[in-house]
């Protein structure tokens, strides 16, 4: 039971207003919506707000391609986004746009406060300029090879492969993503946010419990590398807010985008006078603020955003929760395979409750990627929701309606009810800590118990005997009460089903009412509540996604591993000759405390022992590695890590996680031999 009412503001990351929502996006909105609905079910004051991220060069250029004004395009996209979210039963309390007066005022206010407090620096920089388009190139419109890990085809602000951040001028072999031209350097004056000034505050905040352990560990790496001043300026032409007192200069989209959380809430406060903006955002606020985001935008939300808030006199979020990516059938979402599925394409074929449940069943508090296996998806929904949950009511409700005037009996044996109610605090804890998968397993285990009870009692046999009518009434009433408890537990996940069940019971399902005595309560006639997932509908959805691809006339992507990891840019022989690869024997392997992905390896390279930290924990146990031969980069500069010094790198193949295989040379190779 909730002991006191909390005041909570919860957000999802703002979808970019230049295209449709897809099933990868939907993971986050479903995750956040479940958490928000759970808080409201417990009686807390919870406001779930979001907005379209509507600024930046990509939007300006996309609008030009469509022959539209940017304002017209983002209004159209906003309408489409809101319809998709509504049809997936995402219950925002407010959905707005960063291109709003509220956001302009707040962005200017925060900037001016940062400037007054000495956190904005001005300097002349040399920036990449497209000579064919006569425009400065924002970081996302320069592509090249990552200067840190050498992955090709990376954007000019951060690397999707290794997570590093850098300036566009650090890219190797940069190209304009607008024209393909090789950019030239041109001087311009820019304003910078002095992020290094907040290092001590950020270190304290990131270790305060505000972040998941994996996120905090990643931030430690960034702290070790040193924080850099952040360029918050973009030159005209640009679609966004002009910087105060700086004609022709605009706020970089990542400055005003997170402020969009505040802008959307301010818009809600203007609609609802009883709400106080300052009660949630003032420095001394006692309300709670939580951000749900994808792991690709951790840097902005865990460094820039809390520092901006602190430096301008606002409160920091209580927590930032990151999740992983969505894969489909074990691979990256693919347009050519039809697994890059838009939200609208899914809705054209399947019930949104199916996906809400499947994502919930696989979500945890960790930052693991989630695989949408379409065959498993159909099997799990059919087994859990149709076969276990709804079936519990469908095979008992008819007897209550036809034989007992639609009224439930006084249950004399409350043993099962007590078992079900005893789980409420555990299930509540799982919802609160975002361990939805554990909650779903607990609930389905209870559903198994309830179905076993009905199967053993067999009320369909009881009703054939005059002397067993009351026993049948007891069994069916008990089963329906257990069904009511189960659906109440699932109400944050399955809001549409919960509505149907509320109509069936003719009452609202509440957490405080879990233990309600239902004796004499009248139910409505039972109606079908959920249909089985048909594989032909799943296949039709995939086929439609392929057709959508064909309509765009994009070339088919490469097949196999090259589809997600293309060949890197060509290097010459001299570059390759600099890499010293050696055979190494793994003498010892052990776990690293507080590291989720690392194993510590002691490597014999023929007369010398090296210590290497390798991110292969998900694929190997230490005991499986000891004694094996492998290949290491022997002349890689040592890297100081939080856990110790790493003196090289072992080579492995695979997409990552548990799908990694270290290279194992033939037994004829000996430690120390050079790989040529």
Swiss-Prot record:
GO terms assigned for molecular function: ATP binding; metal ion binding; methionine-tRNA ligase activity; tRNA binding
EC id: 6.1.1.10
Cysteine disulfide links: none
PROSITE patterns membership: AA_TRNA_LIGASE_I, TRBD
Keyword check for ATP-binding: yes
Cofactor note: Binds 1 zinc ion per subunit.
Keyword field contains Cytoplasm: yes
Cofactor: Zn(2+)
Motif 'KMSKS' region per UniProt: ranges: 332-336
Catalyzed reactions per annotation: tRNA(Met) + L-methionine + ATP = L-methionyl-tRNA(Met) + AMP + diphosphate
Motif ('HIGH' region): 15-25
UniProt-annotated location(s): Cytoplasm
InterPro entries to which the protein is assigned, alphabetical: aa-tRNA-synth_I_CS (IPR001412), Anticodon_Met (IPR041872), Met-tRNA-synth_bsu_C (IPR004495), Met-tRNA_ligase_1 (IPR023458), Met-tRNA_synth (IPR014758), Methionyl/Leucyl_tRNA_Synth (IPR015413), MetRS_core (IPR033911), MetRS_Zn (IPR029038)
UniProt binding sites for Zn(2+): 146, 149, 159, 162
TM spans (from-to): none
Domain tRNA-binding: 575-676
Gene3D superfamilies to which the protein is assigned, alphabetical: HUPs, Isoleucyl-tRNA Synthetase, Domain 1, Methionyl-tRNA synthetase, Zn-domain, Nucleic acid-binding proteins
Pfam families, per the entry: Anticodon_3, tRNA-synt_1g, tRNA_bind
Keywords recorded for this protein, A-Z: Aminoacyl-tRNA synthetase, ATP-binding, Cytoplasm, Ligase, Metal-binding, Nucleotide-binding, Protein biosynthesis, RNA-binding, tRNA-binding, Zinc
GO cellular component: cytosol
GO biological process: methionyl-tRNA aminoacylation
HAMAP family cross-referenced by the UniProt entry: Met_tRNA_synth_type1
Stated family: Belongs to the class-I aminoacyl-tRNA synthetase family. MetG type 1 subfamily.
Self-association state and partner proteins as the record states: Homodimer.
Function description: Is required not only for elongation of protein synthesis but also for the initiation of all mRNA translation through initiator tRNA(fMet) aminoacylation.
Protein name: Methionine--tRNA ligase
